[in-house]
A protein has these predicted regions:
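Adenosine-phosphate binding glycine-rich loop
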Residues: 158-159, 178, 282-390
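N-terminal ligand-binding/catalytic initiation module
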Residues: 1-155, 375, 381, 385-389
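Rossmann-like adenosine-cofactor binding region
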Residues: 232-301, 307-309
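General beta-strand structural signal in soluble alpha/beta enzymes
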Residues: 105, 131-134, 155-158, 189, ...
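Solvent-exposed alpha-helices and their adjacent loops that cap or buttress functional pockets
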Residues: 12, 55-60, 96-97, 122-124, ...
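Glycine-rich phosphate/diphosphate-binding loop of Rossmann-like nucleotide-binding domains
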Residues: 74, 79-99, 157, 161, ...
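Short, ordered loop/turn segments at secondary-structure junctions
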Residues: 69-71, 79, 108-109, 134-137, ...
Length: 390
């Protein structure tokens, strides 16, 4: 199937993938008086006295804003907020289908960090959570940080944290396949953008100790010239040996490669220099850093991609619906590191030891167990970490 051509035809037919529907009837005068004036005044007064009642007297408890500035949409780049709308609508469909979360797309026409943050903050009282989407780095880091400081509801940049959760889940099971331990494996990442930074931070939080990040200039290390603020921060907590050199140099004798960068960054010959039973996450889309057949020809044991036509797809739909479902179920004020790690462990645990293999380390997107398992684990972690409010 020509997905581009057929999708365009269907989008013209659909004229939008979501709609607002009423949950109550308005068929009689009494219906009208209860749903709207004069009866609606009473819940308004109750919320005025206690703002937390906005969660029980309105749909706020289940409503997520999916927000972009259109600056980093898929692999298309800075195409503008209006052009990002089909993706935001699609994300809202996935929230509902896989997590039962009502989501609403908002495309903001500003690339000024403070203007964007203030706009989102001013409307945050309508929502139970905020999902940031397709915002270019490094601006996305500052936007998320400032919103988390200002808002009392969860703020989650899925391009960062959803990808990180799935990667941690996959790597947890990949290491079982190859018989290696997180405390001793050496990990190299290609890319230093939003996804790579979040992946590395979550791996560090989970107990991985030997991680080296690479950008276009090679290894990132403390003291390297011309690092931006985010890379300087990452240099403080990665590459403790201050290894310098190219991506190819860093891969020699290392156990794990995680690519969230660009097509063709890795060759079969580079994989051959890695440690025995190498694990490869090659997640650039639609063309990966190295195709699975090439990686396996280079003796990789486990290979993951961002594509649905190969085994072990790194697909964020496994994470964000269940994460928000769990956060909403306990009215969490934040989505923190313990909640993300709990989501990753729940995903990894769905694959039994009997099922686990090099080609099956991550559950399928349509596995009906995924959403409930992630939601339950996230809700439990929210309670244990003190951010649950019910």
């Amino acid at each position: 199937m020509d997905y581009a051509k057929e999708s365009l035809r269907l989008h013209e037919q659909w004229q939008g993938k979501i709609e607002v529907t009423a949950t109550v009837p308005v068929a009689t005068k009494d219906d009208l008086s209860l749903a709207y004036t004069p009866g609606v005044a009473q819940p308004c007064l109750e919320i005025q006295k206690d703002v937390s009642k906005s969660y029980t007297l309105t749909r706020r408890h289940n409503l997520c804003a999916v927000i972009t500035d259109g600056s980093a949409v898929l692999g298309l780049g800075d195409i503008g907020p209006e052009a990002g709308m089909p993706v935001m609508e699609g994300k809202c469909v996935l929230f509902k289908a896989f997590g039962g979360v009502d989501a609403f797309p908002l495309c903001i026409k500003s690339k000024d960090v403070d203007e964007f943050v203030n706009t989102v903050y001013l409307i945050s009282g309508s929502f139970g959570g905020i999902n940031l989407e397709d915002i270019a780095a490094p601006r996305c880091f500052e936007i998320e940080r400032k919103l988390k400081e200002k808002c009392d509801i969860p703020v989650f940049h899925d391009d960062q944290h959803g990808t990180a959760v799935i990667t941690l889940a996959g790597l947890t099971n990949a290491l079982k396949v190859v018989g290696k331990q997180k405390e001793t494996v050496k990990v190299v990442t290609s890319g230093a953008g939003a996804a790579a930074v979040a992946i590395v931070k979550l791996l560090l939080a989970a107990g991985y100790r030997h991680i080296t990040m690479c950008d276009r200039r090679g290894a990132i290390y403390k003291g390297r010239e011309n690092l931006n603020r985010i890379k300087e921060e990452m240099a403080e907590v990665t590459n403790p040996e201050r290894r310098a050199g190219s991506l190819a140099d860093m891969l020699v004798d290392d156990d794990v490669f995680i690519g969230v960068s660009a097509p063709g960054m890795v060759t079969k010959e580079m994989v051959q220099t890695m440690a025995r039973d190498a694990v490869i996450f090659t997640c650039a889309n639609p063309t990966p850093e190295i195709f699975p057949d090439e990686a396996k020809a280079g003796s990789a044991k486990v290979v993951c991609t961002g594509r649905s036509d190969y085994p072990n797809q790194i697909n964020n739909v496994l994470a964000f619906p269940g994460i928000f479902r769990g956060a909403f179920d306990v009215r969490a004020s934040d989505i923190n590191e313990p909640m993300k790690m709990a989501a990753a462990q729940a995903l990894a645990d769905l694959i039994s030891p009997e099922e686990l293999s090099a080609d099956y380390i991550i559950p399928a997107a349509f596995d009906p167990r995924v959403g409930p398992a992630v939601a339950e684990a996230v809700a439990r972690a929210a309670r244990e970490s003190g951010v649950a409010r019910i």
